[in-house]
From Swiss-Prot:
Activity regulation (record text): O-acetyl-L-serine causes the CysE-CysK complex to dissociate in the absence of hydrogen sulfide.
Organism expressing this protein natively: Salmonella typhimurium (strain LT2 / SGSC1412 / ATCC 700720)
Function: Two cysteine synthase enzymes are found, this enzyme and CysM; both catalyze the same reaction. Cysteine synthase B (CysM) can also use thiosulfate in place of sulfide to give cysteine thiosulfonate as a product.
Subunit field text: Part of the cysteine synthase complex formed at a ratio of 2 copies of this protein and 1 copy of serine acetyltransferase (cysE). The complex reversibly dissociates in the presence of O-acetyl-L-serine but in the absence of hydrogen sulfide. Homodimer.
Protein name (Swiss-Prot/TrEMBL): Cysteine synthase A
Alphabetized InterPro entries for the sequence: Cys_synth, Cys_Synth/Cystath_Beta-Synth, CysK, P-phosphate_BS, TrpB-like_PALP, TrpB-like_PALP_sf
Annotated keywords: Allosteric enzyme, Amino-acid biosynthesis, Cysteine biosynthesis, Pyridoxal phosphate, Transferase
Pathway: Amino-acid biosynthesis; L-cysteine biosynthesis; L-cysteine from L-serine: step 2/2
Binding-site list for hydrogen sulfide: 8, 35, 269
Amino acid sequence: MSKIYEDNSLTIGHTPLVRLNRIGNGRILAKVESRNPSFSVKCRIGANMIWDAEKRGVLKPGVELVEPTSGNTGIALAYVAAARGYKLTLTMPETMSIERRKLLKALGANLVLTEGAKGMKGAIQKAEEIVASDPQKYLLLQQFSNPANPEIHEKTTGPEIWEDTDGQVDVFISGVGTGGTLTGVTRYIKGTKGKTDLITVAVEPTDSPVIAQALAGEEIKPGPHKIQGIGAGFIPGNLDLKLIDKVVGITNEEAISTARRLMEEEGILAGISSGAAVAAALKLQEDESFTNKNIVVILPSSGERYLSTALFADLFTEKELQQ
């Protein structure tokens, strides 16, 4: 029987779960989200936020989409917008990689860069300004608070993990950007499937430990870091703090070195936030109580999206970089 997708947004999901054989003790299972249509976990939310807006009747011909992004959500929205015929404007901190900017332009998006020091807050503020200038023309999708974000992970990512492990998942690890992956997957496994002993682990940069601060009842003090895609510097509306059992902080260096290990030792092209998530799994395995647990880790994106970043900074001589 033939299987033809009516447009490329419909091809999200069903990404492979791969056992790591040389990193860790063989119980770390990596969900390789770079196998999505625009090569990151954000393809899922990019598609669902647009589908949801269409269903609700707020997105129709003539309406233009606007969204702040650190890169991967923007790329996901850009490919879905192109596939379904919408115009898209994205606001993004100027510190994000040049590869992301090029991909956004290639997919037809209008890109507005914001001050790097202001982080995602600056990008969000700019997006809100654009929409306020003409609310009838522009629609802000709001990935950080849009319920369509965790919903798609509850409907797809969670069930995929459950089915691929036959329900034998003990620990779920996710870096936190919008919080949608962690929230949606945990809701499905702990709620729908009733596995209340699942240990859900949030990963964030040690340089911007806002989740740990929030859970401890401390003042939120974000800071700059180099782990693109996680650590937005605030607690997103889509992050359900009640679902988190443990928070692991990862340094820039740990994230980068582990991403390199994934490429060199496991043959998995992995981005910086993927390195952070696996580094968190390795930290857990230092505790004997985690030795025999099946640990599922989300690898959000491919290393190819970070060629101009610190991930590849010292791998080539100047001569090797000449064309």
